């Protein structure tokens, strides 16, 4: 799902195309300091402890804050919950621990408060890494082709414009609800894993939600869980959108797609506030992560100078998060789509 429509033309402001023979593994990964791949158990578990404390402080703040401070505490708590996801994200890439079972169980536990099925996300996310910005195969913010948009009914066009436009922050919820609970799409061991993860979070929600409503009421449930959960999904939508969807970065058709280009030119480093990057564990330092998922989050900043030295001309310039940037990103594709449709309509009428 994406707000972007595939563009056939190249923008003059986007990074240079990466040569098709770029030896990504040899030229970049092998030049990295070996220490960036080392998993530090102390750092990994301290991250978990700090994140649990932050979420706990957030919930305490919700309990004691006067009404006019609740929005601030909600944003803090939802951002801290996003940190749970980021640690689980490392677990999904097996960069949290050398033991697969530790990664799986930590991932499941941290995904429980946000009701996210771990294995279905893990499997789908690995596909996103393998086919970043490739039409038909990348499952993160997959765009519509222009002809698909034209052939869709008016209702679907309006829906597309809304949820891939100014309501982008709902995109993560739609992705979560429509993709991650269907274990019938998988086969063999993966089907059993996805079924386990899905039933685990469904069971947890079936117990936790009624219990919260009975003990603290509907407003308490909304105040302590629903609103922080919505903040979490705001960040999920925003992070994942800006990682690979800037006006000058297109999704490519299979015959035009190149893996090295998608990982370098198609990935964006966007800076956020220090407190946000702290609570979300540098999830914005995304280029090193897309070159190799073996780097734990706490080492992601170390190889950045290496990437800039080797592939600097191919990297999209760093940007800073702002509402102006979000407006530019979410408005660009919809505007381009409407211009294209109007132009084609006028051309047809003239003919």
From Swiss-Prot:
Q: Which InterPro entries match?
A: FA_desaturase_dom, Fatty_acid_desaturase
Q: Which keywords accompany this UniProt record?
A: Fatty acid biosynthesis, Fatty acid metabolism, Iron, Lipid biosynthesis, Lipid metabolism, Membrane, Oxidoreductase, Thylakoid, Transmembrane, Transmembrane helix
Supply the domain comment.
The histidine box domains are involved in binding the catalytic metal ions.
**Which GO molecular function terms does the record list?**
acyl-CoA (9+3)-desaturase activity
Cofactor needs: Fe(2+)
Q: What induces it?
A: Expression is light and temperature-dependent with a decrease with decreased light conditions or lower temperatures.
The organism of origin for this protein: Arthrospira platensis
Its protein name is: sn-1 oleoyl-lipid 12-desaturase
Query: What topology does the record note for this protein and the membrane?
Result: Multi-pass membrane protein
What's its EC?
1.14.19.45
Region: Disordered, residue numbers: 1-20
């Amino acid at each position: 799902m994406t707000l972007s429509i595939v563009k056939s033309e190249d923008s003059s402001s986007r990074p240079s195309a990466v040569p098709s023979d770029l030896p990504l593994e040899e030229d970049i990964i092998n030049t990295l300091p070996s220490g960036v791949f080392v998993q530090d158990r102390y750092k990994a578990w301290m991250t978990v402890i700090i994140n649990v404390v932050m979420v706990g402080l957030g919930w305490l703040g919700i309990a004691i804050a006067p009404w006019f401070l609740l929005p601030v505490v909600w944003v803090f708590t939802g951002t801290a919950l996003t940190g749970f996801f980021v640690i689980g994200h490392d677990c999904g890439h097996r960069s949290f621990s050398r033991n697969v079972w530790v990664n799986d169980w930590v991932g499941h536990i941290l995904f429980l408060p946000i009701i996210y099925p771990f294995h279905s996300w893990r499997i789908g996310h690995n596909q996103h890494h393998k086919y970043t910005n490739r039409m038909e195969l990348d499952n993160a913010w997959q765009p519509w082709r222009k002809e698909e948009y034209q052939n869709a009914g008016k209702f679907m066009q309006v829906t597309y414009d809304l949820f891939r436009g100014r309501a982008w922050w709902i995109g993560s919820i739609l992705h979560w609800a429509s993709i991650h609970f269907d274990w019938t799409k998988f086969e063999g061991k993966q089907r059993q894993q996805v079924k386990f993860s899905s039933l685990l979070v469904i069971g947890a929600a079936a117990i936790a939600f009624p219990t919260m409503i009975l003990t603290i009421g509907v407003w308490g449930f909304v105040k302590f869980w629903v609103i922080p959960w919505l903040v979490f999904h705001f960040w999920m939508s925003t992070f994942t959108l800006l990682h690979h969807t800037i006006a000058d970065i297109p999704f490519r058709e299979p015959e035009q797609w190149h893996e090295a280009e998608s990982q370098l030119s198609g990935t964006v480093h966007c800076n956020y506030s220090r407190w946000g990057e702290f609570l979300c564990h540098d999830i914005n330092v995304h280029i090193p992560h897309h070159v190799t998922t073996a780097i734990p989050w706490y080492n992601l900043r170390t190889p950045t100078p290496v990437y800039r030295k080797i592939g600097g001309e191919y990297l999209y310039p760093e940007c800073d998060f702002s509402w102006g940037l979000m407006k530019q990103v979410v408005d660009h594709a919809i505007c381009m789509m409407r211009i294209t449709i109007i132009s084609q309509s006028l051309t047809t009428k003239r003919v």
